[in-house]
């Protein structure tokens, strides 16, 4: 008996900004969004903890080729920590491992914050998806095994005080890729001498995506039930929005054909643009991403497939 052919989704392309609900993993909610859009392909751009809410860009179709750019992008968070309690996961979903008195005033908090701004070295939490010998760290942690982790460079561009109503402290964080907010709060709690863990975490921004374009899962479901797929498709941001921080370069017809075949081309680099660029045709169609070297040669690195209706 032959295998049943795999059902193929729609060739739909773009980025959907989901306001992630609490209590679900990023992968689970991404799969639900994929099914709702009936998309052939989907990928998210950096997991949020199940406890967390907020901006989760979901790439559909050809946009998945550029998800790494959003993984590497700066992010902003609003976080509330509970002082005086430390957990094994550094958030409210973990087991309480230590309780201490909270003898911390606002002045001490404001004095501590500058220590956590700028370029830092952060040791990732054991409860993370980072791999060790092919296995996520959280699997070791759940088995009671602690793995030696190397500190990684991160940057906290902004750490802003919002509110302190003891024992709850609310901060706004603007950080580089790879920053664990749970670890930041745990480290701050140890610095203050009382311990702390995350009780609320909301991602408010990824790269320069507008927060007002986010839609909740409930709103998306309601729209899907009451309208056809074209209404859902209208919610998608263009594929090239994932690389909007790269300078644009418009190619002529001959150059467009060449890069479409993956060929390198030399050009008259009047604007002295070097490094990564996003390429467009003369008709303003997004072609993909390329690298321009010092010899003014364009080398295509990640191109969209223009045979499947990519916008």
Curated annotation (Swiss-Prot):
Which reactions fall under this protein's catalytic activity? Answer: uridine(55) in tRNA = pseudouridine(55) in tRNA
Q: Which branch of life, at top level?
A: Bacteria
Q: Name one GO molecular function term.
A: tRNA pseudouridine(55) synthase activity
Residue ranges spanning the membrane: these are: none
Query: What Gene3D superfamilies does the record point to?
Result: Pseudouridine synthase, PUA domain
**SUPFAM superfamilies linked to this entry:** Pseudouridine synthase (SSF55120), PUA domain-like (SSF88697)
Q: What is its EC number?
A: 5.4.99.25
Q: What class of enzyme is it?
A: isomerase
Q: Which InterPro entries match?
A: PsdUridine_synth_cat_dom_sf, PsdUridine_synth_N, PUA-like_sf, PUA_sf, tRNA_psdUridine_synth_TruB, tRNA_sdUridine_synth_fam1_C, TruB_C
Identify the keywords attached in UniProt to this record, alphabetized. Answer: Isomerase, tRNA processing
> What is the stated purpose of this protein?
Responsible for synthesis of pseudouridine from uracil-55 in the psi GC loop of transfer RNAs.
Which family, according to the similarity comment? Belongs to the pseudouridine synthase TruB family. Type 1 subfamily.
Q: Which HAMAP family match?
A: TruB_bact
Query: What protein is this chain from?
Result: tRNA pseudouridine synthase B
- State the species of origin: Actinobacillus succinogenes (strain ATCC 55618 / DSM 22257 / CCUG 43843 / 130Z)
